[in-house]
């Protein structure tokens, strides 16, 4: 296994593309071989993306009563949870939170809303006005996560100042029906394609620990590679009481790190950011995400769960000898 890991890493650094079968074999690493896998993933990261980390923050700008039935989501109307329910916050609140995110060291700021998608009207106007102000009043790069989107709306948001559009596939095509039946996987794929046609950067990844196999995690890397997304958020399930997956087990820290490492081998030049579930799944090994190939993380709170203080994340990066890079 040791020689196979080293050979795969060398090939990736030289520009080769690994296949799913090779990734599955890498995922068999255990013990000292697993530590070598992490080290080589970190070498690939430094070769392609350098030794700085991108930091992003989000605002839950509209919460709850989502018509989708995603098994993991506290905001789904199909679940009974303690998640807050409120309409779209006003422009002032969106801009205020952008300033707070910038002050806390984030370089990217996501406006996230619950629901299947957004249509022309007052909500879209509020978001566009907020984007214009964020671009003129701060140096932070704004992104949006508004659900399923068409090309025309993507262009409107881009013209208002949106730099990146975030839309997760959540999991592989083969496992998706086990997680969500309220829309089709192809609608998510078409959203990514529409955003790319509009000339907007794409942030697209998923969530792990839903019951998928490791092979299905690798399957998603192939879809992400085919779509040529720009950055990939990696989330780890933090089970919420009242959701369909409330009794799911947390992934072990080493399982999370192995997933990050395999994603770095498969998507060597992409920004890989660890987001939701970092604290609860990785626990004392949070700093290892970068030693396993990640190149960024979300800082501050998540949509419906708490994160940790931004100062702790900055100290972690300083302890690792890493700087903070731009939005990637």
From Swiss-Prot:
It comes from Pelobacter propionicus (strain DSM 2379 / NBRC 103807 / OttBd1). Homodimer. PROSITE patterns: RADICAL_SAM. Its cofactor is [4Fe-4S] cluster; [2Fe-2S] cluster. The keyword Transferase applies. Pathway: Cofactor biosynthesis; biotin biosynthesis; biotin from 7,8-diaminononanoate: step 2/2. This is Biotin synthase. Its EC number is 2.8.1.6. InterPro entries: Aldolase_TIM (IPR013785), BATS_dom (IPR010722), Biotin_synth/BioAB (IPR002684), Biotin_synthase (IPR024177), Elp3/MiaA/NifB-like_rSAM (IPR006638), rSAM (IPR007197). Gene3D superfamilies: Aldolase class I (3.20.20.70). It catalyses: (4R,5S)-dethiobiotin + (sulfur carrier)-SH + 2 reduced [2Fe-2S]-[ferredoxin] + 2 S-adenosyl-L-methionine = (sulfur carrier)-H + biotin + 2 5'-deoxyadenosine + 2 L-methionine + 2 oxidized [2Fe-2S]-[ferredoxin]. The keyword Iron-sulfur applies. It is an enzyme of class 2 (transferase). [4Fe-4S] cluster binds at residues 66, 70, 73. It comes from the Bacteria. Keywords: 2Fe-2S, 4Fe-4S, Biotin biosynthesis, Iron, Iron-sulfur, Metal-binding, S-adenosyl-L-methionine, Transferase. GO terms for biological process: biotin biosynthetic process. Belongs to the radical SAM superfamily. Biotin synthase family. Residues 48-278 form the Radical SAM core domain. Binds 1 [4Fe-4S] cluster. The cluster is coordinated with 3 cysteines and an exchangeable S-adenosyl-L-methionine. Catalyzes the conversion of dethiobiotin (DTB) to biotin by the insertion of a sulfur atom into dethiobiotin via a radical-based mechanism. GO terms for molecular function: 2 iron, 2 sulfur cluster binding; 4 iron, 4 sulfur cluster binding; biotin synthase activity; iron ion binding.
